[in-house]
């Protein structure tokens, strides 16, 4: 009897072991899109006035695969629809209509409808809901290097396989694009702000163009971090002085090359004269001189310059004041297609610090907040931290500028005729 019980326990252990081995942990690849694919496609169609595009094909495919509703889903792009990537979802009986002024807006509406389905928050008959993003540009900054390493990266190596591109295109690129589009991200910077000059070589730009082609149908524009000394570092000029005519011609030629390969290229992110990175101050010039030179080069193509205000240098007597002291004298002197990108705090993504005074002080320059998603000072890959509360504290903080306004208010406001509002997140 005792031997029989022992054998039974052994078998139970073996069965339990096989059961454990058959379990599969969530690997994160499905993101929030953990939906079972339909056995038969849902009824999804475009309105008669809506032309088929690659972006609308994605919206249609997502709904056909995962929408469980019994009625028809109609996708409509209309010039009188909600602007700035906004959308309206309207329920009429069993049918649902998704409308926007842009293809991207319809794609965001499709993901919002699926989110509501997942959350059990479906609209009642006759009810319509309209959503508008607060910022024109919702951009991720990746600090990825050409060799595959990631600065302040705590989630493995870079997904950009530069050594395989342009011949081999990883399926992760589209998976990445889908995840971003599903939460409204519409722009990405592919490489580290401590940029290698080689990122602007013709060979690398051809590889960037392949990634941009994958991201484009998901409504995502591609940006690059650039090394300000690239004309000199690549051995083509003896200087990188932004007021030198040869330097200006070099950048114009490079911009022409980029837009020939990537017609919807977003623009440049620049870290200059900070932590040893080169910049216009190396030649006695100002941040405005450097940013405006690049802005003039990109302006004919609709490109932007995001010029970082993180200008920490060890010789500064007060690190918390340095960005304010270097940028405030030039408020109002930046081109309309320049956005000064300001870290949420005056130091460096600290767990607790006040918001940067530049948000309220620079009233004549477009500024944008830069938040850190990768947890450099908050446990890195070890701890799970709910970051949204910290960001909300910053965005909701009153700046006490003339006329009042929170950080969110002043950064969502467009300063110039051609300005665009933006918010950045530094991601693994």
What function would you assign to each model-found segment?
Residues 1-8:
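N-terminal secretory signal peptides that target proteins for export/translocation
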Residues 9-16:
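Sec-dependent signal peptide recognition
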Residues 14, 25-93, 124-126:
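Acidic, contiguous N-terminal accessory segments
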Residues 27, 62, 83-86, 91-269, ...:
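Feature activates predominantly on carbohydrate-active enzymes
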Residues 142-144, 192, 224-228, 272, ...:
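A cross-domain feature marking catalytic cores of carbohydrate-active enzymes
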Residues 196-197, 232-241, 271-282, 310, ...:
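Active-site-proximal beta-alpha loop/turn segments in soluble metabolic enzymes
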Residues 260, 278, 285-428:
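Substrate-binding groove of N-acetylhexosamine-processing glycoside hydrolases
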């Amino acid at each position: 009897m005792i031997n029989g019980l022992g054998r039974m326990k052994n078998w139970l252990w073996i069965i339990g072991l096989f059961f454990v081995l058959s379990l599969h942990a969530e690997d994160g690849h499905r993101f929030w899109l953990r939906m079972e694919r339909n056995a038969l496609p849902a009824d999804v169609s475009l309105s008669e006035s809506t032309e088929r595009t690659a972006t609308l094909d994605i919206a249609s495919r997502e709904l056909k695969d995962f929408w469980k509703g019994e009625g028809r889903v109609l996708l409509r792009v209309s010039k009188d629809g909600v602007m700035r990537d906004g959308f309206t979802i309207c329920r009429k009986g069993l049918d649902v209509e998704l409308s926007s002024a842009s293809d991207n807006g319809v794609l965001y509406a499709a993901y919002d409808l699926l989110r509501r389905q997942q959350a059990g928050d479906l609209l009642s008959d006759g009810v319509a809901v309209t959503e508008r993003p607060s910022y024109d540009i919702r951009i991720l900054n990746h600090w990825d290097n050409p060799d595959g390493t990631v600065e302040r990266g705590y989630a493995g190596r870079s997904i950009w396989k530069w050594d395989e591109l342009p011949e081999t295109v990883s399926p992760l690129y589209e998976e990445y694009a889908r995840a971003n589009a599903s939460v409204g991200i519409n722009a990405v910077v592919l490489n580290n702000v401590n940029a290698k000059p080689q990122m602007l070589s013709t060979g690398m730009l051809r590889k960037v163009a392949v990634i941009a082609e994958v991201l484009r149908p998901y409504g995502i524009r591609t940006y690059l971090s650039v090394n300000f000394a690239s004309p000199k570092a690549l051995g083509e000029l003896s200087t990188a002085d932004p007021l030198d005519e040869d330097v200006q011609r070099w950048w114009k030629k490079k911009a022409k090359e980029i837009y020939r390969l990537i017609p919807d290229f977003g623009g440049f992110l620049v870290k200059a004269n900070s932590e040893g990175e080169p910049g216009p101050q190396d030649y006695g010039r100002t941040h405005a001189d450097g940013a405006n030179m690049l802005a003039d080069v990109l302006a004919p193509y609709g490109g932007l310059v995001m010029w970082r205000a993180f200008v920490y240098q060890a010789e500064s007597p007060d690190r918390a004041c340095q960005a304010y002291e270097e940028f405030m004298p030039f408020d109002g002197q930046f081109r309309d297609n320049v956005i000064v990108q300001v870290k949420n705090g005056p130091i460096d993504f600290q767990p607790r610090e006040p918001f940067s005074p530049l948000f309220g002080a620079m009233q004549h320059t477009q500024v944008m907040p830069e938040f850190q998603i990768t947890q450099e000072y908050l446990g890195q890959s070890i701890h799970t931290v709910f970051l949204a509360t910290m960001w909300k504290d910053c965005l909701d903080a009153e700046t006490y500028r003339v006329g009042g306004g929170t950080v969110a208010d002043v950064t969502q406001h467009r300063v110039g005729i051609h300005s665009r509002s933006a918010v950045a997140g530094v991601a693994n």
